[in-house]
Every structure is written in C-alpha cells, then in structure tokens.
Amino acid sequence: MTRLAPGENPPQFVIFSFDGAGWHDRWTEFREAAAQVNARFTGFLTGIYLLTDEHRDAYTGPGHSPGKASVNFGGDAATVTTLVGDLNAAWMEGHEIGTHYNGHFCADNPPGGASWSTADWNSELDQFFGFWNGWQEIDGLQGTPPLAIPASEVKGGRTPCLEGNWDQIAPAWAAHGLTYDSSIPGSGIAWPKQEYGVWEFRMQTTSSPALGSVMAMDYNFWYKFNKAKNQPERAPEIHAAVLETYRHMYEAAFIGNRAPVLVANHFNQWSGNAFNPAAKEFMLETCGKPETICATYQDVIAWMNLQDPAVLAELQARPAVY
C-alpha cells in the first residue's frame, strides 16, 4: 500500500463480495479464480450456517421462535465442518469473512431488520459471534478442526435484504467492534464515507447499458431482467447483461472518480446459474488490469486510513458516476 501524492490518481479498487458464503463448490470456484489473478474478496457469512439442522433451536431470531429462519440452517455435521474448512482456507489465502447476520428476516417474514431495535440487533450479533466461537460445542463436534479465524477479524457486513433502521443498528455495530457496513442504498458509484460511526460502502446504482438504472446486486439484476422469474433457458442472456453491467461500472469509475466498484453477489445458481459465472468472468478479466486492485473491504479501509486526510477528502468530494 502506498500513500498518494496530491493530484495522484488512486488505484481502481474492485470489491467482490458474496452474501451467505455457505456453499463449498462456490468457495472452491472463486478461490481458484482469485488465485489466478491475485484477487482477494469478501464472504459475508450467514451465522446459522454454523449450526447443524439438528441444533437449529440454538438460534432465536428477534421476534421469532427458536429454530426459525428465512433461510436454511447448516445441514448435517459433514456440511458444517466442510464450511469451516472453506472459511479457514479462504482466510489463510487473504480473503475476508464478514457477517450477513443470521436468520435473514426481512419484510416478507416479519419482524425483519427494518423494524428491529438496537436490542434486537445486539441479540442478532451476540448470537452470530456466539455461533462463531461456540459452534463445536453447540453441534457436538468438539473433535473436528476449529474455526481458526479470530472473531475479532469480523469487522463489517451486509444486512439481509439491505434492511435496517440505521440509527438503531449503529450502536450494535459499535458494541461489537464493527468498523464498516455495506447495506445502505446509495446513488451511483462513489467513495465511502464515515456514517453512523463506521465506514459506509453504500450499495451502488448504475446506468447499465443492458438493464437501465439498477442497484448493482445480482438479485436486483435478476429482478430488473424478468422480475426474478426462473428462466434457465435465458441464462446466456442474463449472463451477458450482468457482465456488460460490471464492465460498464468498471469503466465509469476508472475514467471517472476511481471510486471502489462493488460487485455484490450471493453464492447461487439462480435461473440456470446465470449470475456467478458472470462475476467470475469479470474477476478473471479485470483483476489483472493495470492500476486495478481486487481487494477486500478491510484492504480498502486500510488504504484509505493511510492517505493524507486532505487527499482522501478530495476523493470523497468527487461526484458519483453511474
């Protein structure tokens, strides 16, 4: 990392992130791709993926009954131990693990994050870190290899469905040592700023040549394309539209304000596996380009903290690009 001189252009950061981060095949696929182009990326772990189905009652979502969630739990013991191995391997390779919280409770399964209080968010994060530190005891798997990543390495995350009352969640971030978030919807592609006591990497919007004005996340691309209908036969069309959108975002930022580009995804196989291959193709073609660094959120924060405050302020004052 280097400190910019006044007037010097920053590198073009690209931050790949994956919500959920609980699928072995996808961990393997993206770790292998990243290794080819010296990329680092972030996985936002759903905490209940560390609980076997048998021990799902260890989780109580705020306002919900024990053992209930809007997503699956971790499966059997072999699946959970495989996930822990994936997390350990990814972290050792320089990738980052953050939080996607736990039960994925949103407006469609209330009460969701948009209505939770600070106490609710504290409970959600207390449980996330409780699973992180205690999954072996909860699941009865004390003889298996531990999760080797210190809980203190989890510094940020993304809320399910991008929901939250930010005044309510901010004290919970502070109480759990979180230093960044990437949940609040933004406008365009812009430099992160300090908001609510953390670095806020606002979710980006772009004027996609293929999709029009859209929030830059895989599910939002899908919804804009066909209202998120499962049409596997159209996977090549979706893939092309998503890849064109990523390329447009990169070029807009590279020749514009050089703000970090957020490639926000889930590990998924939606609509005939249209989305993850587009993200991987973009990673492979972009991360080796000159003046380009594919990094984690913590990497970019460390770089920003290294800069002269006046230089960083000039970057943050640059208008958003679309």
Annotate the PLM regions.
Residues 108-127:
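Active-site cleft segment of glycoside hydrolase catalytic domains centered on the general acid/base Glu
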Residues 55, 211-215, 273-276, 306:
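Short conserved micro-motifs at the rims of enzyme active sites and ligand-binding pockets
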Residues 17, 26, 99, 120-122, ...:
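Glycan-processing catalytic domains of CAZymes
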Residues 59-78, 144-257, 308-315:
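Active-site-adjacent pocket scaffolds in enzyme catalytic domains
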Residues 121-147:
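Short N-terminal edge-element motif at the start of the domain
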Residues 2-3, 177-193, 244-322:
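C-terminal domain-boundary segment and adjacent tail
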Residues 26, 30, 82-86, 90, ...:
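Alpha-helical packing segments of well-folded alpha/beta enzyme cores
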Residues 1-96, 103-107, 138-164, 169-170, ...:
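Active-site beta->alpha N-cap acidic-glycine motif
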